[in-house]
Structures are given as structure tokens and as C-alpha cells.
């Protein structure tokens, strides 16, 4: 990461940088991009250069963007990022604005969650048909139920990677059931996962 930061410093002379994604939380591997928001004078741009064998996903914004009105929803990806440079305090203010926005986001009502969980059981019955459509619905259910699980737990959903890590950390038994449903692809494993979903709704 040091060489990447050196490259960004030399090229953009930034006043702020927020690293987010896998390089911020330590989950990166050899295939990971380096996600970073750079605050630097000049025009807005995207840098996808390869530095030290790592592909950059660097979004460069002039500080003027954050001095006026902007939509924090456009920057939610940095909510748990690491501020590695902030000479004028703009990066800290940006992250605080994003966190305030996320705190104010409404969660689904429990009635809505119950309807979604009922949809999961209904969808499970449609996976029994044994044809291409049935298998499509099976995959669809496994994907969509992760979002519904987050709603049931009263978590905001920030993509599968963060959702799975949070589930593994806070609900390891449910994580094991979901992983089994994904890997085994059997009706019994699917039922076990949906049982966890219903349990979360009632907790």
C-alpha cells in the first residue's frame, strides 16, 4: 500500500485520501483493487492505473465539491474507510456527513420484513419444480435472502462481502447455515437457512 500512496501523492498532491474496501479492512488478496477517494485540486477523474501489481480504483475529486451542496449517498462506500491524509479536515467532515446520512436511513418495518420472509418460503416451494426455472429461482432466493436477513437483523446492507463478514462475526451459526445452503445446494440446507431467517425476524 505504501507504494500506491506514494504514487497518488506524487501525481495529485492531494489534501485528503480515504482508503476503503478490502485494503481498509484487511480482507484484500492478489485480485483486489485498491479503492481510494482522493481530494485534490483539478478536475474530477478516475485513475485505474496499475501500481506495484495492484489495479487502482481511485476517484479524484476537487475539494470544491465538498464545500458546497452534495449528496452523501454518492459516497457511502467510504463510511468505514481509513483516512490516511487529511491536511485540511475535508476528509473527516465528508465521512462524518456520510455516517450521519446512514444513521438517518430508515429501516424496513417488521411487517415488510415478514412479507419478505413469507416470499422466501413461497419461493422455496417454487424451487421444487426441478427445471431450469426452478433452479433459477433457487439461486435467486439464495441471493435475495441475504438482503432480507440484513433487514431482519436491522442491519444496513452494504453488499455481500460486508454482510457476510458481519454475519460471521455476530451470528456464526447463521453464517454456517447460509454457507451450507450455498455450498450443498440441497433442500434441507435451504430450509435450515430459511429457519435462521425466520429466527432473526423473531429475535
Q: Would you name each region that the model predicts?
A:
Residues 1, 5, 16-18, 76, ...:
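Generic, low-specificity signal for short hydrophobic/alpha-helical stretches with a mild N-terminal bias
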Residues 1-31, 37-84:
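Metal-dependent nucleotidyltransferase catalytic core
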Residues 2, 6, 10, 15, ...:
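Glutamate identity and glutamate-enriched acidic tracts
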Residues 5, 11-15, 26, 35-37, ...:
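Residue-level signal for well-ordered alpha-helical segments
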Residues 24, 30-36, 50-52, 65-67, ...:
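Generic preference for flexible, low-structure residues
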Residues 33-34, 42-44, 48, 59-63, ...:
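Short alpha-helical interface elements
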Residues 47-132:
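Conserved NTP/Mg2+-binding pocket subregion across the NTase superfamily
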Residues 109-203:
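Conserved nucleotidyltransferase catalytic core and NTase-mimicking acidic/glycine-rich helix/loop elements
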Amino acid at each position: 500500500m505504501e507504494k500506491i500512496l506514494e504514487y497518488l501523492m506524487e501525481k495529485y498532491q492531494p489534501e485528503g485520501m480515504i482508503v476503503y474496501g478490502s485494503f481498509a479492512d484487511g480482507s484484500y488478496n492478489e485480485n483486489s483493487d485498491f479503492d481510494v477517494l482522493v481530494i485534490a485540486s483539478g478536475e474530477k477523474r478516475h485513475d485505474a492505473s496499475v501500481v506495484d501489481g495492484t489495479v487502482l480504483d481511485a476517484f479524484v475529486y476537487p475539494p470544491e465539491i465538498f464545500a458546497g451542496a452534495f449528496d452523501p449517498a454518492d459516497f457511502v462506500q467510504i463510511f468505514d474507510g481509513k483516512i490516511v491524509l487529511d491536511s485540511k479536515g475535508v476528509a473527516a467532515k465528508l465521512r462524518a456527513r456520510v455516517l450521519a446520512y446512514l444513521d438517518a436511513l430508515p429501516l424496513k418495518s417488521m411487517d415488510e420484513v415478514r412479507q419478505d420472509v413469507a416470499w422466501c418460503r413461497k419461493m422455496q416451494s417454487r424451487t421444487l419444480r426441478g427445471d431450469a426455472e426452478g433452479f433459477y429461482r433457487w439461486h435467486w432466493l439464495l441471493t435475495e435472502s441475504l438482503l432480507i436477513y440484513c433487514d431482519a437483523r436491522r442491519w444496513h446492507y452494504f453488499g455481500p462481502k460486508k454482510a457476510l463478514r458481519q454475519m460471521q462475526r455476530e451470528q456464526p451459526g447463521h453464517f454456517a447455515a447460509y454457507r451450507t445452503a450455498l455450498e450443498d445446494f440441497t433442500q434441507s440446507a435451504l430450509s435450515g437457512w430459511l429457519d435462521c431467517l425466520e429466527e432473526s425476524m423473531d429475535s
